[in-house]
Amino acid sequence: MDKDNAECFTQVASSGDAALLGLGAAAAVAAMQRGEFTAERYATALLEQADRWRDLNAFRTLDRDAVLQAARAADERRRRGGALGRLHGLPVPVKDSVNTRALPTSNGTLSLSGFRPSADAGVIGLLGEEGAIVMGKTNLHELSFGWTSNNETFGAVRNPYDLARSPGGSSGGSAAAVSARMAPLAVAEDTWGSIRLPASFCGIAGFRPSRGRYPDDGIMPLSRHFDQVGPLARFVEDLVLFDRIAARDARAIEPRPVTGMRVAVPAALWAELDPEVERVARHALARLREAGVSVVEIAGSLNEVARAAGIVGTIVAAELRGSVADFLRRHDAGVAFDDLYATLGSNTKNLMDAMVLPPHTPTREAYEAALRERNALAASVAAGMREHRADVLAFPVAMVRAPRIGEETGVTIDGGRTIDAFDALGRNVGLGSCVGMASIVLPAGRADDGMPVGIEFAGLPGGDRDVLAIGLSLERLLGGVEPPAVRA
């Protein structure tokens, strides 16, 4: 248990249920397993917090009665001496693009608002086997196709640090729920930044695993090359807990010693940043250096990493329509792609028209060229990291702080400069998606306006355990950020 978890736990008995909200998932589960408090008491505290923060619009569906009933069942199991799972009694919000049998899965779009999957997604089944309770389905950018979670059908998700700003997307509801202490751990999904951007903008941690590390069945797709389910949490130990369950890997992951750790900083992903983002992120790197981490600035090799976003964009645009149509057929959603398209909100439809549909659909030649470029870039990144003996690459998750709600095509920063959204939000997260890297996001600090800034630490594909071990160490050095303002 880390220091913040320990402090929260010691306050529980004396300060009522408010202190429960500060516990991480692993700490809360351990306390419930010991009988320090009941699952029903814990679930009630989280549901009351969700009510306090209702104006964030984090949840699409929230069945309070079902959550409390499941919590009581968990308590009864413990009283009877039954086996308790690693997520015993833990309510977990689930992004509404991930199939759940008990609740509708809308993917944030009107035509699927009544879709009831016949089975849970694979990852939900694994969490349930360990005692997790589906707390509800979280709001998101429509079809998971966007970076703001400004959903025109079900309403915009709002950032707990500033209600006028976006929490990022597309997993904005999951991130807002974790940031606002409605739950310590949530299920999200990342095609092109949809875990990492919300983690950064909401001041929490997130993990995009290597492609294929977790089961991907029952998750509404955009691209077969890039879609990846993953966790959002306030503490890295909870990302580790999720990983061990979802990857079916029981081995412990311990913090990586700082001695000998090498972090490479690719200049191309630090160019033209919002000055406040750069200031906060540079200060975080300085703290790592002071603690003994070897931080290596790379000005020459690896400069081509900024090409990744364009490659990802071409592949996603080529695969999206077929991927969505195939999912709708296989899961008997009762809706065809054309029907779904007809009911899209304007910001999603405009993006679809500009990227995916004729005459803008990438040609077969362009698609195949992008796949070749992807493979070449992956080889180049691996070679560059070996050359510099880098354990991870480090760069700001986004060029900007959280956009204001309504900034869909461009983000205006201090001084009046507007950065195209493709660059502002998509450039840096493109690398991890394109190369299939194991990537963890940690809070670096807060800008002068109080908004969080996150750094992505990206390791080579297959290096998930190493990246999580590094994350456990770096989290302690960076220290996290203050949570959003308390609501009584």
Enumerate the language-model features and the residues they cover:
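Short glycine-/acidic-enriched loop or helix-start segments at secondary-structure transitions
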Residues: 103-104, 144-146, 197, 274-275, ...
